[in-house]
Amino acid sequence: MPKASHQDLRFAFRELLASGSCFHTASVFDPMSARIAADLGFEVGILGGSVASLQVLAAPDFALITLSEFVEQATRIGRVAQLPVLADADHGYGNALNVMRTVIELERAGVAALTIEDTLLPAQFGRKSTDLIPVEEGVGKIRAALEARVDSSLSIIARTNAGVLSTEEIIVRTQSYQKAGADGICMVGVKDFEQLEQIAEHLTVPLMLVTYGNPNLRDDERLARLGVRIVVDGHAAYFAAIKATYDCLRLQRGRQNKSENLSATELSHTYTQPEDYIRWAKEYMSVEE
């Protein structure tokens, strides 16, 4: 079977956006997981920013990974991927000019699409970790991203955190990003179908949801009718890999103590030590959670 080119995969992603169906992402974090996802029939994969931070730095999701580190991992995946890969490009690694550099590098890495979010990252002195940038700045980032791409088949998706906004504020932001030319809108933190319906009726571009398995949004047919084309349930595959590695090595060492039989969540916490970063952010930056 002939291999798909990067542009082929970008067109395949656009076909998903143009379809009438809803597709769930596979969490791909290295070349092997990308090959597995494609072989199992997943239509789309995602390289999450949080997962890249774990994989490359063994660090929690505090915007610590650099653009070059993220691009290197995306490039490794892009060499072998035979499914469209969506890159979670966080805040674009800086201002609108940095966003342009991010788009250039990720396009060369071979991703099919990328998200740019409007969270104020990295955390700023004296601000909340969930604060958003002004909508005007977010619009500038989307416009800059569109200007920077060479291959027009690369999809640029604007992302916002619905969990920290009123429904009215979500509508204003998402409509602004749609008007700026975003190929799709990604939202994290949508509570339920009632809220989604209120937002969706104001938008015409395809939608992407990061649900983390929210039980109030588990109806693919209903999601599809509301324009949702991509759903990110989370990154279970990555955490399962951590758990499998731990269990295998623990068995090799003959450590059968039940107290050491940790869950994937416990393992992630143990080996990334997020409480240290929270303490440092509060102590050195006066960042409020």
Swiss-Prot record:
Binds 1 Mg(2+) ion per subunit. It is an enzyme of class 4 (lyase). One of its GO terms (biological process) is oxaloacetate metabolic process. Substrate binds at residues 50, 159, 235. It catalyses: oxaloacetate + H(+) = pyruvate + CO2. The keyword Transport does not apply. Catalyzes the decarboxylation of oxaloacetate into pyruvate. Seems to play a role in maintaining cellular concentrations of bicarbonate and pyruvate. This is Oxaloacetate decarboxylase. The lineage of its organism: Bacteria, Pseudomonadati, Pseudomonadota, Gammaproteobacteria, Pseudomonadales.
